[in-house]
Structures are given as C-alpha cells and as structure tokens.
Amino acid sequence: MKKLTIFLVLLLTAGDAFSQQQAGMNKQELLEYFDQTFANIQTEIEGLNAEQLKFSPGEGRWSVSQCLYHLVITEPQLLEFVRQAMDAPADPSLKDSVKITDRDIIMAVTDRSHKAKAENELTDAPVYSSPREALSALESSRKIIKDFIGKYTEEELRNKVIKWPVGYADAFQGLLFIAAHAARHTEQMKEVKSDPSFPKLP
C-alpha cells in the first residue's frame, strides 16, 4: 500500500494544478467508469499467453500479471477504507474541506509521469496462466464494489468525507479513485506490451 499512499499525496496536492471548478460526476457515470476500466483491461490482456503475462520489461518493473494481481489485492483494501468512512458518523463541517474535484482525481491518478519501483509484495506474486483467470478474480471484486455503490445515494456518498494524511476527499471520490487506479495500471500494461522484448505470439 506504500505506493498508493504516494499516489494519494500526489493526488491531493495536485488540486491547484489540475482543478477547473466544474460539475462532478454522478453515480451512473461512476458505475460506467468502473465498467469502462474493466472493459479496457479486458481488451489489453485478451489473447495473451502465460509467457506474455509474466514478462517483465526489466528489474523493478511489473509484468502484466503483477499489474493485474496488484489490482485484485488493492481494490478490496481501498473499498474497505471507503466502507469505514460510510459507517462512521457524518461530519458536515468537513464538507467544505474537500477542495479536489473528480476531474483532478482521474487526471492525477492516471498520470504515468509519476512512477514508483515495484513493491516487494509483488515480486513473488502468483502468475496468472490466462487472461480469463485474472479477469475472473477482478470481476468478483468489481461486483462487490458495484453492489456497495448501489446501497447508497449520490448524496450519501458525497456527504461522507475521508481524511487522508494530506487532505480531504469525499467517499464518492474514494470510489472514483479505485476505478482511476485501474485505468493507471491499464496504461502500465500497455507500456509492458510495447516493450521491444515483449514475447510475440507464435
């Protein structure tokens, strides 16, 4: 989770640079963004074999399989963080503390100019043998997330404010972060596939 903490610092300090005060996303758009990010992952890994899934472009750089495993293990952790916020009493006085916009979150999290070395937790990550195996694991966690979103109104998600070490975001934005985080790693998968040494199909 260390790298996610770095992302949050970048995210919540990027508001002044990215912010263009505009209407945020609605709940339907949030759900569609989750669907879109899943479909994009499916497109990127479709047809890859086990060798391609485990290929790493170099030391400290993740394979497609590691990117997928990272999403599978971190999305439930991030959801739990949002769940705890929703279970806590609302503090209306914090609502004005949210300065970052939905657009800021997507732009900052998907910005691949900020990169970090692979964490030790993934160096020995299991290798998925097929795209279907990876997608099945991710699909299960996505269903839980979408069911969670369905339990609340947009107003309820906006009224619960999460305090990060460097700022504030509402619970809706915490969920948006999960989908944007997947979009970020989809771009990373594209980078892996574009490496000159990436194994070719026979």
Give the location of each predicted region:
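Bacterial Sec-dependent N-terminal signal peptides
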Residues: M1-M25, P202
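Short N-terminal segments immediately surrounding and downstream of signal-peptide cleavage
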Residues: Q21-Q42
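Second-shell loop/turn segments in exported
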Residues: G24-L30, Q52-G58, S63-Y69, D124-E133, ...
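Metal-centered catalytic cores of metalloenzymes
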Residues: Y33-A39, S136, E154-E156
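Hydrophobic packing residues in well-ordered alpha-helices of helical domains and bundles
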Residues: F34, A134-L138, L175-I178
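Acidic interhelical loop/turn segments
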Residues: T43-G58, A116-Y128, K143-G174
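Short, contiguous alpha-helical
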Residues: F55-I105, K151, E155-P202
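Surface-exposed, polar helix/loop patches in the mature regions of secreted/periplasmic/lumenal proteins
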Residues: M86-I149
